[in-house]
């Protein structure tokens, strides 16, 4: 099959990062059903964390999607690729009404904003900022144009504008969060009546959605949004927050901002945080970590 060069490049990046995220499409289908629910009883029908039948399906599916011998995209050059699916997986898919083998899901807009930004740059448009509702930002810079980005921290079920960071040069960012931020988020989150949240950050190891922090900002001067997202996804979709892994990622050019209590921690030595939240009995401070 011959595809657009942008899609081919996306699969090249996925391959080079050793990622299996797009192959999780059948698992994402369950989460899409969950996110579209209007009440808890409906949501539980799709939730692998609460429904043992769904959990069993997810476990079986992961045995295939995490196995390159069961499913893999073969890149043939000249924008040609082939989707290889084993007979065993094809039979499993047929028996379980699986109709989608591939889905970029939450990562999709990362590739889209990168494509738009690169296309604009090729045509000498270097001013302005491209953002998406689900956390991707390409700040093009140009003529010293600055971008102020708010960083939030969830406290008692509400987002606190903990600090502000100014991007004074061209810079790309990915913002992970574990809560709905606008009406557009309704298809990417579900919040149970007890406050538990289901998000789009599915761990490919067990098929469960996770969030190691309520908020995590990752950014880079050199890498695009898709590269940042792939580098940081495992840091966020995790049972616990690994500070050492975050610092290691920062050494590779992808810096982080996150909260530890009321400390807004940042890894870039030259970064400046302002407008630290001081209200409602909360007093946020900034802390450089290295």
What are these regions (language model features)?
Residues 1-290:
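Mature catalytic core of soluble alpha/beta enzymes
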């Amino acid at each position: 099959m011959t595809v657009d060069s942008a899609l081919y490049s996306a699969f090249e990046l996925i391959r080079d990062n050793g990622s299996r995220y797009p192959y999780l499409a059948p698992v994402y289908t369950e989460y899409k059903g969950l996110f579209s629910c209007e009440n808890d009883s409906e949501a539980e029908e799709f939730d692998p964390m609460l429904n043992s039948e769904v959990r069993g399906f997810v476990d079986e599916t992961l045995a295939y999607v995490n196995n390159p011998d069961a499913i893999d995209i073969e890149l043939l050059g000249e924008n040609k690729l082939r989707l290889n699916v084993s007979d065993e997986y094809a039979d499993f898919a047929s028996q379980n009404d699986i109709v989608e083998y591939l889905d970029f899901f939450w990562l999709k807009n990362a590739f889209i904003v990168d494509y738009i930004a690169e296309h604009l740059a090729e045509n000498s448009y270097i001013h302005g900022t491209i953002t998406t509702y689900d956390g991707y930002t390409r700040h093009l810079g140009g003529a010293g144009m600055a971008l102020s980005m708010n960083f939030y921290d969830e406290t008692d079920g509400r987002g606190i504008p903990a600090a502000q960071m100014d991007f004074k040069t061209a810079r790309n960012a990915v913002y992970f969060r574990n809560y709905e931020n606008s009406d557009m988020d309704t298809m990417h989150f579900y919040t149970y009546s007890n406050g538990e949240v289901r998000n789009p950050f599915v761990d490919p190891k067990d098929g469960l959605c996770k969030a190691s922090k309520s908020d995590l900002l990752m950014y880079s001067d050199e890498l695009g949004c898709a590269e940042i997202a792939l580098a940081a996804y495992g840091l966020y979709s995790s049972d616990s927050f690994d500070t050492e892994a975050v610092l290691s990622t920062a050494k590779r050019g992808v810096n982080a901002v996150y909260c530890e209590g009321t400390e807004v921690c940042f890894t870039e030595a030259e970064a400046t945080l302002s407008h630290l939240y001081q209200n409602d009995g909360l007093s946020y401070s900034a802390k450089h970590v290295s």
